[in-house]
Amino acid sequence: MNLKVLKVIDGETVFPPPIWMMRQAGRYLPEYRETRKKAGSFLDLCYSPDLAVEVTLQPIRRFGFDAAILFSDILVVPHALGRDLRFEEGKGPLMTPIDADEIFWLETEGVAKRLEPVYETVRLVREQLPDETTLLGFCGAPWTVATYMIAGHGTPDQAPARLFAYRFPEAFEKLLNDLADVSAEYLIEQLGAGADAVQIFDSWSGVLDEDCFERFCIRPVARIVQKVRAVYPQARIIGFPKGAGMLYAGYREKTGVDMLGLDWSVPLSFAALLQEEGAVQGNLDPLRVVAGGNALDEGVDAILERMGQGPLVFNLGHGITPQAPIENVQRMIDRVRGGKS
């Protein structure tokens, strides 16, 4: 096996750099939209191994990415904890907001076992994936998952969760610890089922001040990493604290993750400094893929020029948007791999 992504995570420089995209199995692909219709609901798609395998493999068949990422959602963890969860068109995920008292009644024992369909998807994907393609599992970071559990939906600045944390510090700390423990079990099961590496998505870390970032983002992720490595000491783990800004510095060392996922707001000069301490992943603005043309080419070239001589997995700085034209995705891949656009 020649798993380029794993080599980079381990600190090697691979040229051209391996490439995959967050949300690469998604609505920009016509084949995904067809499979999504068959599934009925979004959650049914996540929990139906045959269909989840199909959408996981679709971008690999079409583009030959160097990594496949398990098709699922970060909110299957609170769903397994017994929280009601539904996805509505145009509204995204919706849940009944959890209150402080309910947190003390959350039962975490055996919760990860309720996600067996996800592990079956991992097993089936690994069987069908080309040997040279890395299979990534993932979970949401406790802070980001907690924001949805508290507000009941996504909010622009996660004010409900921040206010909850200030008002109910004990309950909030318990929620983060519970989510960290269940998420660690969840990742352990994914690794056992055949995932080559895992990514922890902290999509809302950028709304916190420095003290809260340390307590709500770094400590819970470090707890996950420690628990995963107690079972799989060599586990390769990617951390993606989107929007962390200057607080990216020290994140790898404090949490124990191997590779840093960078969002598109991270200056390339700062990204290059972060790369000196280990592998980085990112960080093209997803809207450059929507725009195409010179905007896309210039964005790709700038990243390759600044970081291509070190350990880099080329990716977007967040998930690809449904509006992205397929031909622009191919143009990006060709440019990264040195072909003509």
UniProtKB/Swiss-Prot annotation:
Cellular component per GO, a single term: cytosol
Cross-referenced Pfam families: URO-D
Question: What are the GO MF terms of this UniProt record?
Answer: uroporphyrinogen decarboxylase activity
Keyword annotations for this protein, in alphabetical order, are:
Cytoplasm, Decarboxylase, Lyase, Porphyrin biosynthesis
The EC number(s) this enzyme carries: 4.1.1.37
Q: In which pathway does it act?
A: Porphyrin-containing compound metabolism; protoporphyrin-IX biosynthesis; coproporphyrinogen-III from 5-aminolevulinate: step 4/4
Q: Enumerate the Gene Ontology biological process terms.
A: protoporphyrinogen IX biosynthetic process from glutamate
Site residues (Transition state stabilizer), renumbered to this chain: 73
InterPro entries, per the entry: UROD/MetE-like_sf (IPR038071), Uroporphyrinogen_deCO2ase_HemE (IPR006361), Uroporphyrinogen_deCOase (IPR000257)
Question: What family does the Swiss-Prot or TrEMBL record give for this protein?
Answer: Belongs to the uroporphyrinogen decarboxylase family.
- The protein's role, per its UniProt record: Catalyzes the decarboxylation of four acetate groups of uroporphyrinogen-III to yield coproporphyrinogen-III.
- The protein here is known as Uroporphyrinogen decarboxylase
